[in-house]
């Protein structure tokens, strides 16, 4: 490719602009903002003997753009030639035919493992969300932010504990927690 030339869409784009899995990439510091709230909540889970597996924290806007529009093209909700450009993402969504454009977008959707329409802007793109799986916590007691303990009889009991830290569960999205529950 020469300077200024765009690269065709396809699964090769999925490894670019990776989503972070690091709490350090969330907004804020240990004392105040979302990062600090998450750090304290995770520390409480681990102190109780639970385990945490993080699948996503900060998602670069470029990745959100690629996910959002690849899914829209794949589902036939937008034509490849109607996708707005994004600075810093030199992708050419348009292939020789609309069918090939859609096929390339479908390859991206499959590689991203997209199930629901990804948001162009989300709590992840501003560093205010975490996707995580919590294990080994049922039957244990976890400290709330005020120091009292809550018995975790079933995993959903952890939602109220998270809320005390300002880490709010989005019920409809199993791994998703954020600063506002969205």
Task: Show which residues each predicted segment covers.
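Cell-envelope/glycan interface and biosynthesis
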Residues: 2-171, 175-181
């Amino acid at each position: 490719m020469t300077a200024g030339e765009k690269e065709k869409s396809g699964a090769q784009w999925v490894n670019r602009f990776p989503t972070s899995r690091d709490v350090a990439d969330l907004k804020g510091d240990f004392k105040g903002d979302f990062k600090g709230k998450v750090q304290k909540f995770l520390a409480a889970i681990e102190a109780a003997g639970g385990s945490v597996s993080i699948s996503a924290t900060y998602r670069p806007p470029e990745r959100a753009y690629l996910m959002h529009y690849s899914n829209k093209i794949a589902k036939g909700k937008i034509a490849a030639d109607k996708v707005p450009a994004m600075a810093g993402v030199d992708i050419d969504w348009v292939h020789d035919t609309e069918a090939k454009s859609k096929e390339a977008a479908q390859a991206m959707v499959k590689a991203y493992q997209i199930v629901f329409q990804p948001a162009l802007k989300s709590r992840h793109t501003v560093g205010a969300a975490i996707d995580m799986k919590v294990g080994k916590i049922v039957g244990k007691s976890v400290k709330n932010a005020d120091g009292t303990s809550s018995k975790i009889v079933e995993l959903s009991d952890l939602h109220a504990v998270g809320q005390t830290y300002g880490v709010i569960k989005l019920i409809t999205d199993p791994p998703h927690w954020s600063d506002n529950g969205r």
